[in-house]
């Protein structure tokens, strides 16, 4: 049997329809607010559901470089920024901690659909050579763990 280990959550970060940082999101939850809104980004006349819960006012300026933004789907960018917020929220000096004792836990329902759709259209119109080699890693949820760990010097 493996030795039991304690897990301590030291920092949290969130990008959500209720806010793009922890305190705002928490206050909106306590206030009973909903992140759902009528869809205005496209015509929903033919759709049975006319609402969604989009992330709004996402500010990545101080968190992501241009190359990362170009290579990964916006939902992966949410995960990267939320991870950075969690690290900041922890208050830990990461350079002074054994990296084998640090982990990042990330949750997401679904994402990358914009990137998948754009690449499917590109494939059909222009052929496979026009698909970016960053298509799959830029569209899947595990991308943010892969991209976050070097940022916080864990690998």
Features from the language model and the residues they span:
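Active-site pocket-shaping loop/turn-to-helix segments
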Residues: 14-23, 66-81, 128-140
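ACP-dependent fatty acid/polyketide chain-elongation machinery
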Residues: 1-68
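Structural motif
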Residues: 6-8, 102-103, 134
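Hydrophobic alpha-helical hairpins/lids featuring a short glycine-rich hinge
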Residues: 85-131
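Conserved small/polar residues in nucleotide/adenosyl-binding loops
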Residues: 145-151
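N-terminal amphipathic, basic-rich helices that act as targeting or association modules
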Residues: 2-4, 8, 72-85
